[in-house]
C-alpha cells in the first residue's frame, strides 16, 4: 500500500490481484445496476468457482449455478431470474460506469451531467478535451483529468460487455428538464418513477 496525495488515506497497490477487492467490486457493480436478492456471500461463491469477472457472471447459466455449494434448483432459478430481471433490460450507462469502479470517486450524478451534454461520449470514440469537460457544471479540472485518463478503459469495458442495452432519455427541448426535490424519506419507487 501507499499513502494518497494528502497523506490521510492508504491506497492499496495491485488492486487487480487482491481477491477481496475483486469480490467487493463485483458486489458493488451488481448492486449499483439494481440486481436484488443476491448477497456478497453468493458472489464470493461464484468468484471462487471461477466466475470471477462481471462478464462471466452475466453469462452464467442455471446449470453453472447448480454446481455451486449449497445451491439447489429453486435457488438457481431465483438467482438467475434476479440477474436477468436487470441485465436483460435497458440500464442507464451512468449506473454501469459507476458500478465498475473504474472512476473510483466519480459517481452517478457527475456522469449524468456529462452524458446530458455528450450522450455518446462513453460508447463511441468521440474526441473530447479538458476544456469541454470543465464547461459542464460541477466538473473541476481534477475530475475532468481523471475522466479523460480512464475514458479508453470505460469504452473498452462497454465493448467487452456489449450485451448491456443502454437506457437513453431524449429531451425535446431544454424546458423538459425538471428539478425535483423530495423531502422526508426517499422511497425507492418514487425515485424510480422520477428517473424513468
Language model: regions and residue ranges:
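DNA strand-break repair and replication-stress modules
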Residues: 22-25, 38, 49, 69, ...
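Long, low-complexity intrinsically disordered regulatory regions enriched in P/S/T/G and acidic residues
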Residues: 1-11, 63, 74, 149-150
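Compact, charge-rich alpha-helical regulatory domains located at protein termini
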Residues: 32-41, 48-72
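Cys/His-rich short segments
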Residues: 1-36
Amino acid at each position: 500500500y501507499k499513502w494518497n496525495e494528502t497523506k490521510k488515506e492508504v491506497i492499496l497497490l495491485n488492486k487487480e490481484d487482491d481477491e477481496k477487492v475483486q469480490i467487493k467490486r463485483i458486489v458493488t457493480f451488481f448492486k449499483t445496476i439494481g440486481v436484488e436478492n443476491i448477497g456478497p456471500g453468493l458472489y464470493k461463491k461464484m468468484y471462487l468457482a471461477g466466475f470471477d469477472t462481471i462478464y462471466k457472471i452475466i453469462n452464467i447459466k442455471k446449470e453453472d449455478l447448480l454446481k455451486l455449494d449449497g445451491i439447489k434448483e429453486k435457488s438457481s432459478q431465483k438467482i438467475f431470474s434476479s440477474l436477468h430481471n436487470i441485465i436483460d433490460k435497458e440500464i442507464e450507462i451512468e449506473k454501469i460506469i459507476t458500478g465498475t469502479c473504474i472512476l473510483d470517486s466519480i459517481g452517478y450524478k457527475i456522469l449524468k451531467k456529462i452524458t446530458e451534454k455528450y450522450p455518446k461520449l462513453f460508447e463511441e470514440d468521440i474526441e473530447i478535451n479538458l476544456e469541454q469537460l470543465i464547461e459542464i457544471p460541477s466538473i473541476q479540472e481534477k475530475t475532468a483529468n481523471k475522466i479523460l485518463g480512464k475514458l479508453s478503459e470505460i469504452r473498452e469495458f462497454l465493448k467487452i460487455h456489449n450485451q448491456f442495452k443502454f437506457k437513453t432519455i431524449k429531451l425535446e427541448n431544454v424546458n423538459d428538464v425538471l428539478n425535483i426535490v423530495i423531502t422526508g424519506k426517499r422511497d425507492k419507487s418514487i425515485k424510480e418513477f422520477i428517473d424513468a
